[in-house]
């Protein structure tokens, strides 16, 4: 990976800085980003995707991300380090190079990534996916 990209990804974002400064245990999620039903948080596709075919971001570090689901597909790529996630009640540890693909409505919780951990999120609207091809990729260990 190009060194300037790596440096940029490891830079501490404003959100990460707030997580550290305020000793946050849970990442702050904008109220516009989700709908709440009972105690469940559903991340809105419009907040991230905004009519895009894919949305890519670095997952915020230094605080847990609360349990949530969404109506789009999410792929996590562990670029560096490791992170523990609870996915539909199952605990999984992602290590450098691991990819996790989650279907819509999958409930997952991300434990706080540390300074050496880089988790990349890719989000896709469901209508952009060829499900026949996806079925050949998915295995019994997929979420």
Range-by-range predicted roles:
Residues 2-21, 44, 111-143:
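A hydrophobic/aromatic-rich effector-binding and dimerization subdomain
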Residues 19-40:
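Eukaryotic acidic, serine/proline-rich intrinsically disordered low-complexity regions
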Residues 38-43, 50-70, 107:
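Conserved short histidine dyad/triad with adjacent acidic residue
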Residues 56-58, 77, 112:
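Conserved hydrophobic "DFG−1" position in protein kinase catalytic cores
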Residues 68-85, 122-126:
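Short, conserved beta-strand element in jelly-roll/cupin
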Residues 75-79, 98, 106, 114, ...:
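Short, flexible loop/turn elements at secondary-structure junctions
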Residues 82-84, 100, 104-110, 128-130:
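Histidine-centered metal-chelating micro-motifs
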Residues 89-104, 118:
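Short acidic-glycine-tyrosine-enriched beta hairpin
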